Amino acid sequence: MEGHSDMEIIRAVKGSATGEINVHLVARDSAGSHPHLPTTTFIIPTNAATLGLPSTALDVSYPREPVHVGAAERVAGSEPVTATILPQLSTGPGTNSTVRLLDWTGVSAPLAGSGMRFRINEYATQNMIEIERPRSPEQRHEGGTAGREADIQHPDVHKDPQEVIPQEPSVDAGSCKCQTCGPQQSIGLDVGSSGDRCPQPFQKRSVIVENSGCTVASELIKPMKKRKHKEYQSPSEESEPEAMKQGKGKDPDREPTPGTSENEEWSRSQLVSSEKKEGWSWESYLEEQKAVTAPVSLFQDSQAVTHNKNGFKLGMKLEGVDPQHPSMYFVLTVAEVCGYRLRLHFDGYSECHDFWVNANSPDIHPAGWFEKTGHKLQPPKGYKEEEFSWSQYLRSTKAQAAPKHLFVSQSHSPPPVGFQVGMKLEAVDRMNPSLVCVASVTDVVASRFLVHFDDWDDTYDYWCDASSPYIHPVGWCQKQGKPLTPPQDYPDPDSFCWEKYLEETGTSAVPTWAFKVRPPHSFLVNMKLEAVDRRNPALIRVASVEDVEDHRIKLHFDGWSHNYDFWIDADHPDIHPAGWCSKTGHPLEPPLRPRESSSASPGGCPPLSHRSPPHTKTSKYSFHHRKCPTPGCDGSGHVTGKFTAHHCLSGCPLAERNQSRLKAELSDSETTARKKNQSNLSPRKKPRHQGRIGRPPKYRKMPDEDFQALPPSVVHQSLFMSTLPTHADRPLSVCWEQHCKLLPGVAGISASAVSKWTIEEVFGFVQTLTGSEDQARLFKEEMIDGEAFLLLTQADIVKIMSVKLGPALKIYNAILMFKNNDDVFK
């Protein structure tokens, strides 16, 4: 049977001249039924002056904590319980052959083999400032024998610096400082009592003196290292620091082991990915590639500007040119600011029309600019052109107009001499460079003018200056022996004559002397620079000059396939010298490494550095495989341009199999150009839409009268709303394969099929989906067909169409699933 003994009182009494110190250990049975056991007294010779004990007795009471004594070590409580302190002897000079019991570190020192610690007070005497509480039986059992053996150390081993107790400020000789409560005044230092009564727990565990029935010199108890307090942790919490310790010093690019946590692998992969991007630099890359960058002198001032700060803020409103219709000015809102670039949103229209410009772009103007210059401004959807007012619009939308000083001043730019509105010239079709067509000057702003091709829609228009290599004086084609494309539907295209045409239209030609000759650029092949990815304009990548012409360069994105190469003007605002991104604060996409490109295959999982956040073990769905498998693609952008993100190969603008689709959208195909070149008198492409030239409305068949009854604050709801999340790294809010089963009539239907639905078909689908005829009737009243239905956002359904949130979520999720099915089927 196991017995217990309590460490009750140790009385240290200052001895006589011999300096004896009697240490009494009194053991008592826990039940109190046995008399006191025999005690063992150790007489340790030392000088009282060495210890500096006060004249009064020093009583030290230990907390009454039971000490386990094995039954095999004592029989019926007859054997004494012995605790021994082994002093460190010092025979150096000046020690007077005394025993140095305290190991001084600064002004405090612990007593070896005990939990007591002493310090020197302002009177140069030693006071005990701390005593540690013995461990409970449960704590001792937790440590076990292995823990005791690991904690025992020799007196000459230095302690861990973390375990050195800092000096307590201003504690006088008569005070005891509790670890938790603070100083306690007492005449006789009774630390054990104050510690017992302290309502707050001790922060450290004590070292217990183990008892032995038979002890020899080699088995004397040695000073023990204090064990740090360990908070209770759940198994998952305990495994995390262990995994972190195991991960130190290992290769960050190693493959995950079976015992490695998936969450840890994802966190590590994100860190590695960010380190790769942050660790990339132009200097090291140029040294590695043995290449040179394009000198800054080769760029225009607008391309190389880095000293100006981008002062535009989110939500600011301004006026700007529509890139798809360069002759039209729209109300725009700053939807995103990145470095020295802006993403602009057309107020009242879908985000699929958003576009990027530099902050110094000449195509943007402050609010009210159109009134001062006499231009025509297209108001947001729902506003009448003649009733639109900037002041009223800003109040209704609670928005701020972009300050005028943020725009590039164009007042110092003189107008082009000789170019006036209505004058005729010959111009190259930028979408079909092999064609030179009859054109007119339709607008002049500062030093630029707008070139418009006669009798064609404005989608072919472009802005240029007098030195543009794409414009020529009247009669240039005849002198060069090149065919001239007459205006569309010209009565007698075979016999087109400039003199007759100018007389019929009552116009004049731009003087020949007004045209300026632009010298060719000086870019060389293999020069490095930074360029906007035209397939995903939000990104700027490291590029190289692959080929050159007089006024154009062919760019290649380093590390990517040559299928992505494209031609661009040498003065285009989307190319910048090396280092432009870092100076303006814009992220730069580093070159795609061969390892990255080979580690991911079409249809497979992306490499570790491109992983999505892992799902937990309790999660029902995993979005790891919903990531775009194209190497180096972050999931942003879409091949159709209608969405801001994608997660399938069919929607990736960087996928090689989609390049034909992209080229068809970026410019007309070479086949079409050849056909037009062979028959230069054949009509060009018909206008993309009949009637009023401009951006197609959000609801194609919704009459304008329906919007007049809506307040402006309700109409302007499409800002910052997207059909898909902008960041594809974030998991989608639904799992298509599972949730499509919960929505009737959604599975197996693609967006291409929905776009052909009639108004009645949309009405029937909404009625079946929501089970409410009233909700479906709203779509019928608004004359929403399939194509308009796919353009709806959640905010449109809830706020504009006043559909309740529950049915609106079903409808919007159905739209997202249609689009996802379209990607899957393709």
From Swiss-Prot:
Task: State the source organism's domain of life.
Answer: Eukaryota
Q: Where is this site: Positioned at the entrance of MBT 2 and is required for recognition of monomethylated and dimethylated peptides?
A: N432
Positions of post-translational Phosphoserine modification:
S136
Q: Which stretches does UniProt call biased (Basic residues)?
A: 612-623, 683-700
The residues the record assigns to binding Zn(2+) are C628, C633, H646, C652
Specify the taxonomic lineage: Eukaryota, Metazoa, Chordata, Craniata, Vertebrata
| Gene Ontology molecular function, alphabetical | chromatin binding; histone binding; histone H4K20me2 reader activity; identical protein binding; methylated histone binding; nucleosome binding; SAM domain binding; zinc ion binding
Source species = Rattus norvegicus (Rat)
Domain comment as written in the entry = The MBT repeat 2 specifically recognizes and binds monomethylated and dimethylated proteins. In contrast, it does not bind trimethylated proteins. The MBT repeat 1 does not bind methylated peptides but inserts a proline ring in a Pro-Ser-Ser/Thr sequence context.
**Which residue ranges are recorded for the region named Disordered?**
134-155, 220-272, 586-623, 663-705
What is the protein's quaternary organization? Answer: Homodimer. Interacts with RB1/RB (when monomethylated at 'Lys-860'). Interacts with p53/TP53 (when monomethylated at 'Lys-382'). Interacts with CBX3, ETV6, KMT5A and VCP/p97.
Q: What does this protein do?
A: Polycomb group (PcG) protein that specifically recognizes and binds mono- and dimethyllysine residues on target proteins, thereby acting as a 'reader' of a network of post-translational modifications. PcG proteins maintain the transcriptionally repressive state of genes: acts as a chromatin compaction factor by recognizing and binding mono- and dimethylated histone H1b/H1-4 at 'Lys-26' (H1bK26me1 and H1bK26me2) and histone H4 at 'Lys-20' (H4K20me1 and H4K20me2), leading to condense chromatin and repress transcription.
Localization, UniProt: Nucleus
Q: Which GO terms describe its cellular component?
A: chromatin; chromatin lock complex; condensed chromosome; nucleoplasm; nucleus
Region (Interaction with monomethylated and dimethylated peptides), start-end ranges = 453-460
Biological process per Gene Ontology, one example term: chromatin organization
Give the transmembrane ranges: none
- Can the keyword rRNA-binding be found in this entry's annotation? no
Q: Under what name is this protein listed?
A: Lethal(3)malignant brain tumor-like protein 1
Q: Which keywords accompany this UniProt record?
A: Chromatin regulator, Metal-binding, Nucleus, Phosphoprotein, Repeat, Repressor, Transcription, Transcription regulation, Ubl conjugation, Zinc, Zinc-finger
- InterPro entries annotated for this entry? Mbt (IPR004092), MBT_L3MBTL1_rpt1 (IPR047361), MBT_L3MBTL1_rpt3 (IPR047362), PcG_chromatin_remod_factors (IPR050548), SAM (IPR001660), SAM/pointed_sf (IPR013761), Znf_C2H2C (IPR002515), Znf_C2H2C_sf (IPR036060)
Query: Site described as Mediates recognition of monomethylated and dimethylated peptides, positions?
Result: D429
Q: How is it modified after translation?
A: Ubiquitinated in a VCP/p97-dependent way following DNA damage, leading to its removal from DNA damage sites, promoting accessibility of H4K20me2 mark for DNA repair protein TP53BP1, which is then recruited to DNA damage sites.
